[in-house]
Amino acid sequence: MLRRKKTKPMAAMTPEQQALIQRIQSLVTDQSDVREVSMFGGRAIMVNDKMIVSAGKAADLLVRVDADQHDALLSEPGAAQAEMGAGRRMGPGWITVSSEAIADDECLSFWVDAAMSYNKAVTRANQN
């Protein structure tokens, strides 16, 4: 008998979150393996089965970056150490960016590019 894996429906998105996801999707159209997943209380964009960013309900952005670049990227406007719940800091390589700091496409592109750089490095490492 064939068994199908049950998948939960994705959580509903806020209008702000949906708009941010559309903007992110437009920045990764050149990638062949892109999908959305509900993760970290938001909607994550996965490239090559690895999260690059997750859009929060308030249109803030959780970004996965190279841990070696973490401190330098924290100096960017609107960037903060990511937390999973009150006071539970995530490790190096996880940054939250405020919605105000990614209001224009150039700023959003900066963060998606940073995440894609890490994604490409990790994907290459896993292929070797």
Please describe what each predicted stretch is.
Residues 1-128:
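Charge-dense, helix-prone N-terminal extensions
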